Amino acid sequence: MLERHHDVLAPTLLGHAGGPPLQGEVSEALIPDAVERAMDDAGFETAHIVGNSLGGYIALQLAARGRAESVVALAPAGGWAKGDESFKETLGFFATMQDQLRAAAPHAEAIMASAEGRRRATQFIATNFEHIPAELLAHLMCGVVGCEVAPMVEYATREGYQLDAAKVTCPVRIVWGTDDKLLPWPSAAARFRDDWLPQADWVELEGIGHCPQLDVPLESAQLIVGFTAR
């Protein structure tokens, strides 16, 4: 659906499976720098930028750099209230989850062949799984295992998340599922709502999980296209 309205560039983030490896010391600028290079290589000076979780946080960082015409952030990371240390527990869970999936990944296709396997595989990211192809879920499982989680988690745990919100001057829509088990609504959005981006267009998706693009793909696409068309 998005391709009918926009030229789509979908770069894989540094340190994520299928993307360039992390090189050098991890820093706040490392991943946004790489996305900017991908935009430059593709000829995009600015773009309507969409991201989920860490990708949503990166989208907002790119907006602060003046690279976004608009941003749609789906449950962006980094929104815990100042002083809320629970984000460290969340980051630790990502590392633990990767360890658990590493043992299961060689059997990904067999796991996803059953409805129960697909339900368990999506329990932290989506509330609706029946429509998601088994092949995609197997690919996602192997993708999680292929991420360089440890150095990114170590950096974020130590340094936290920052956003120069005053420099985010483009329109921003933030979409959050009320049944998000990884970044729970509304606590994981507190700093975005109260300090950084209270003026954003906020959309709550009742009963939806952490990855709306998997949970309700058509509605997610409509929320993106409807916002970029303004």
Task: Mark where each language-model region is.
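Alpha/beta-hydrolase active-site loop signature
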Residues: 13-17, 78, 209-212
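Conserved alpha/beta-hydrolase catalytic His-Asp/Glu region
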Residues: 106-167
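Catalytic histidine-centered segment of alpha/beta-hydrolase-like enzymes
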Residues: 208-221
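Structural signature of beta-strand start/N-cap positions in the alpha/beta core
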Residues: 7, 45-48, 69-70, 171-173, ...
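Flexible "cap/lid" loop of the alpha/beta hydrolase fold
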Residues: 68-105
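Conserved loop-alpha-helix segment in the C-terminal half of the alpha/beta-hydrolase fold
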Residues: 166-208
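Active-site loop/oxyanion-hole signature of alpha/beta-hydrolase fold enzymes
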Residues: 7-54, 61, 86, 222
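Short glycine-enriched nucleophile-adjacent loop
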Residues: 56-66, 71
